């Protein structure tokens, strides 16, 4: 009996040695940046990543790439949004993010490397005691952000003039599969859309591939769009 148990014990011990320690929480910087730049937040010692959104024809509609320091600060961030014809490329320089091409100061930072102000748009951000961005405001609008106990973004509410747009996300009850979620969008308390996402995960509990279904309920009949998200992630 002892001889039969030995290989099993060795296998368990070896597996334990190789097991990656999973970090279930999201840093304030990762969660807050994901809100502002519209990408899925990641966990653990991320070194660099690229998230690519593709439509049903396999055409790239959006791509977000970032590099991070070992402390979790974004050293660079690049956003390519083909649907809205938008390109943003930022590089960290002391207390600012500069435009990667013109080197113009674009975003002022607070604390270690958290968002503070976007001077050109008159936008300023406020953080809570844990360093998460909870408010953004300008002369034209006010936004409030919500997070769960692990720092996962649960949605936001935007108020501008006489309009209130609210997005509420409900993640999976499995803490490993946080990016499996559903979300509902309300405009002035009227439902105008819903989202459902399901993913496959790596050993750090980060998504490597997802299916994203977006339903526009603001039109009749409702329009459903299906997207695929591909992630490449390197770790420290």
From Swiss-Prot:
Intracellular or extracellular location(s): Cell membrane
A Pfam family the protein falls into: UPF0257
Signal peptide range in chain numbering: 1-16
Keywords, in A-Z order: Cell membrane, Lipoprotein, Membrane, Palmitate, Signal
PROSITE patterns: PROKAR_LIPOPROTEIN (PS51257)
Coiled-coil residue windows: none
InterPro entries referenced in this protein's UniProt entry, alphabetically: UPF0257 (IPR010646)
UniProt GO cellular component terms: plasma membrane
Principal location: membrane
Lipidation (S-diacylglycerol cysteine): 17
Residues with lipid group (N-palmitoyl cysteine): 17
Topological category with respect to the lipid bilayer: Lipid-anchor
Family assignment from sequence similarity: Belongs to the UPF0257 family.
Protein name from the UniProt record: UPF0257 lipoprotein YnfC
Gene, per the UniProt record: ynfC
């Amino acid at each position: 009996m002892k001889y039969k148990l030995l290989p099993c014990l060795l296998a368990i011990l070896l597996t334990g040695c190789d097991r990656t320690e999973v970090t279930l929480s999201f840093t304030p910087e990762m969660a807050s940046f994901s809100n502002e730049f519209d990408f899925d937040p990641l966990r653990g010692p991320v070194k660099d990543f690229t998230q690519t959104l593709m439509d049903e024809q396999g055409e790239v509609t959006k791509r977000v790439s970032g590099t991070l320091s070992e402390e979790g600060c974004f050293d660079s961030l690049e956003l390519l949004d083909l649907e809205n014809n938008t390109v943003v490329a930022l590089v960290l320089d002391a207390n600012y993010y500069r435009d990667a091409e013109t080197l113009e100061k674009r975003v002022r930072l607070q604390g270690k490397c958290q968002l503070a102000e976007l001077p050109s748009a008159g936008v300023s951000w406020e953080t809570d005691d844990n360093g998460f961005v909870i408010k953004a405001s300008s002369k034209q609008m006010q936004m409030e952000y919500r997070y769960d106990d692990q720092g996962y973004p649960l949605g936001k509410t935007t108020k501008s003039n006489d309009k209130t747009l609210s997005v509420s996300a409900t993640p999976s009850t499995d803490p490993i599969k946080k990016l499996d979620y559903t979300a509902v969008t309300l405009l002035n308390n009227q439902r105008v859309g819903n989202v459902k996402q399901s993913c496959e995960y790596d050993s750090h509990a980060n998504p490597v591939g997802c299916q994203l279904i977006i339903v526009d309920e603001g039109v009749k009949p409702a329009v459903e769009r299906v997207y695929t998200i591909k992630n490449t992630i390197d770790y420290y």
